[in-house]
Amino acid sequence: MATAVRGLKLQTEDYFLTDKNVVMVAERHPQPVFPLHHHDFDELVIVWRGNGLHLWNDVPYRITRGDMFYVSANDRHSYESVHGLELDNILYIRNRLTLSADWQRLLPGGEHPQSQRHWCLGSEGMDTLREKVDALRQECMKSDALSLQLSEALLLQIALLAARYRHTPDNPQLADAHQLDMLMNALRASIAAPFRFEAFCEQHHFSARSLRSRFKEQTGMSVPHYLRQLRLCKAMELLRYDLQTIGDIAALCGFEDSNYFSVVFHQAFGVSPSAYRQRFLNVE
């Protein structure tokens, strides 16, 4: 198999204010297309709005508001197909953090499976975290002793609050969730199963028109388009790592007709599912 491409390496001296600072915030409002890269620092990525394709260690994620990633220094990732994507990267040098905290648990690194480093936030969690991130953004632009300590203390607060409010992408609907959060959770849980938006709204006594409009405003996509993107990202993952037939993969990703799946996949990525899979097969 061909050697994995490492891409660009982002250096600490280009992103941290001084060699004393161990925490920084890289604001990306918007986040442009950015090529494959890795770092010599770790980062916590929080997506606020818009959408894009996050390719992380060769696994595709269709990201939008509420997605959160714990990215380690050795991870390789890129951003593609971005549309109004806004996110913050909270950068930190793990081995230079001085506060007595269980950093390995609060900010899981490369020793944890990738599936345990992708989480989602609801509206309440996003509002709470955004306030702390904004405070850190201001504090980390100073290098006096008190500001350095305050920056690390704010990172600890962010890590604790993230652990409190985060949930897995396929988490069941939460009874106290906001309408938009409930819809996002339902869509993430409907990759393999049919999803009927009108029935969902009727079941929860939501205004379909209002919710549809708010979803488009926050994500930059319609509900059907977002669900299709989730399904296509799952298909990309299965085509890379699973040996099931194209038809079986189509069914697992919510497409009843494998021919239709092939057409949609080709329209999205410019290549057929079988040709895409061929790229990742071992070459003798």
Swiss-Prot record:
PANTHER family: HTH-TYPE TRANSCRIPTIONAL ACTIVATOR RHAS, HTH-TYPE TRANSCRIPTIONAL ACTIVATOR RHAS-RELATED. The record marks D248 as: Interaction with sigma-70. This is HTH-type transcriptional activator RhaR. The keyword Transmembrane helix does not apply. HAMAP family: HTH_type_RhaR. It comes from the Bacteria. Its main location: cytoplasm. Pfam families: AraC_binding (PF02311), HTH_18 (PF12833).
